[in-house]
Design a protein with these regions (language model features):
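N-terminal Rossmann-like FAD-binding beta1-loop-alpha1 element of flavoenzymes
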Residues: 11-38, 211-224
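Feature captures the FAD/FMN-dependent oxidoreductase FAD-binding
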Residues: 79-154, 158-164, 281-292, 307
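A Rossmann-like FAD-binding core segment of flavoenzymes
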Residues: 118, 222-330, 395, 401-413
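Glycine-rich dinucleotide-binding loop and its adjacent helix/turn
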Residues: 2-6, 89, 157-227, 233, ...
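Residues at the starts of beta-strands that form the adenosine-phosphate
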Residues: 12, 35, 204, 229-232, ...
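Conserved Rossmann-like nucleotide-cofactor binding loop
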Residues: 21, 44, 162, 213, ...
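C-terminal, flexible cofactor-proximal segment of oxidoreductases
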Residues: 2, 311, 315, 321, ...
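Glycine-rich active-site loop/strand segments that organize a redox cofactor
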Residues: 42-96, 188-194, 235-254, 365
Length: 422
């Protein structure tokens, strides 16, 4: 049964997050003539991307623009930037997302500065079942005016994961002592060569993490050492090697392969010191920086540094969904049917199958996780896949089950990956 058969059509669809996937959901709803409201926590659209706007994506323009959004934009004379060019996050916002959000069909439906803190059913906690599917959703949000509540016929949560990093500690909990050194620990993807340059120049930075966010920061720090020779770099990983970063013979995406080769070369040249098999348990403050306490090969060890960059990946904020009936994989916290397709122990970006609404459903009819948040803790998210998700979800909301069930995404033979996006 589709949503239009159960829920009041007079209510809008609520989209949480005005990043690329949230705006793509809106574009698809525009084409289907369905009312919606986007609730964005930041003061501007794409607030998470703006924080790492200096970082260049691995994927070219032709793979990072949603088809429905492109149709709406091209109707106004907009042109796709150089299809093979690789945009930075800032260029993605300036040349695509801002023009999209400014369209008459979207602009008046976007509310910024609205932090959704909880989603439930109106008058129902998660234990009540009778007439649940036909009861509107209720969103509670914090705004500049205070706490407000909104109702919706369906909810698409595209709020991303960038604001919710994984722990530095191997336990998954914040390391002991973190509160004492927060001023010396940076979030993933700091702007080392731009606004954050003074913080890192001439200092010893330890980058923690084994993915491409870590690699991008390592490369930026290496470039900084050429201008500020006193700058030192340590790369701390908990496994024996950083398999997602190091060069692979079968890597088909040139930009991503280049990162692996460049990091390998810097390590070989001794410009990046690698400390492997280090599991962090505690952080302590020193006169000049941070002391990292951990276990390495079964022995207690210490590592001193001026600054720490936490590039350990991200996790979804599920606390806001406590009253929603979710069915999540117990390991990666993705929708149960999607999880086997994206398990990072099995799949890379190039092997994740396209999927539609059926893989994204929960026991809560009309509620969907989409975009980066739908991948839980898996690091293999593709923007193109997020666009396909919301195309299918919005078709289901419209009652077009045939379109919702069809897979329209045609992935190229090689991987198509984005850096972190909301």
């Amino acid at each position: 049964m589709s949503l239009h058969q159960r829920s009041p059509e007079s209510l809008p669809v609520a989209i949480i997050g005005a990043g690329p996937v949230g705006l793509a959901a809106a574009a698809n709803l525009v084409e289907r003539g369905i009312e919606f409201v986007i609730y964005e926590s930041g003061d501007e659209i794409a607030s998470s991307i703006r924080q790492w706007g200096h970082t260049r994506l691995f994927s070219p323009w032709k793979h990072v623009v949603d088809p429905a959004s492109r149709r709406l934009l091209e109707a106004t004379g907009w042109q796709l930037p150089a299809p093979e060019g690789l945009p930075t996050g800032a260029e993605l916002v300036e040349n695509y997302l801002e023009p999209l959000a400014a369209l008459d069909s979207l602009a008046h439906r976007i509310r910024t500065g609205v932090m959704v803190e909880a989603v439930t059913r109106r008058g129902m906690d998660r234990t009540r079942t009778a007439r649940r599917a036909s009861t509107p959703f209720l969103l509670r949000a914090r705004t500049v005016e205070g706490v407000e509540e909104f109702t919706a016929r369906a909810v698409i949560d595209t709020s991303g994961t960038y604001a919710y990093p994984n722990s530095l500690a191997s336990s998954g909990l914040d390391p002991l002592g973190l509160a004492d050194v927060t001023d010396r620990v940076s979030h993933a993807l700091p702007d080392v060569l731009g606004r954050d340059r003074a913080r890192f120049a001439g200092r010893h930075t330890t980058v923690v993490g084994a993915g491409h966010s870590a690699a991008n920061t390592l490369l930026a720090l290496a470039e900084l050492t050429e201008q500020e020779p006193e700058t030192r770099i340590t790369w701390l990983i908990r496994n024996a090697s950083a398999v997602r970063v190091t060069t692979s013979d079968d890597e088909g995406l040139a930009a991503r392969a280049s990162i692996g080769r460049r990091v390998d070369a810097l390590v070989t040249a001794g410009r990046i010191a690698v400390v492997d098999r280090f599991e962090i348990v505690r952080l302590g403050r020193t006169d000049d920086g941070v002391r990292v306490y951990g276990s390495r090969a079964g022995e207690l060890v210490e590592h001193d540094t001026d600054l720490v960059v936490s590039a350990t990946g991200f996790r979804p904020n599920l606390a806001m969904l406590r009253e929603i009936r979710l069915e999540l994989d117990e390991i990666i916290e993705a929708p149960k049917r999607l999880a086997p397709l994206i398990d990072p122990n099995v799949h890379t970006c190039g092997t994740v199958e396209p999927h539609v609404f059926a893989e994204l459903t929960h026991p809560e009819p009309g509620f969907f996780l989409a975009g980066m948040k739908s991948y839980g803790r898996a690091p293999t998210f593709l923007l193109a896949t997020g666009y396909e998700q919301v195309r299918s979800i919005t078709a289901w909301i419209a009652g077009d089950i045939t379109a919702a069930s069809n897979v329209e995404l045609k992935l190229p033979a090689t991987a198509v990956c984005s850096t972190v996006c909301s």
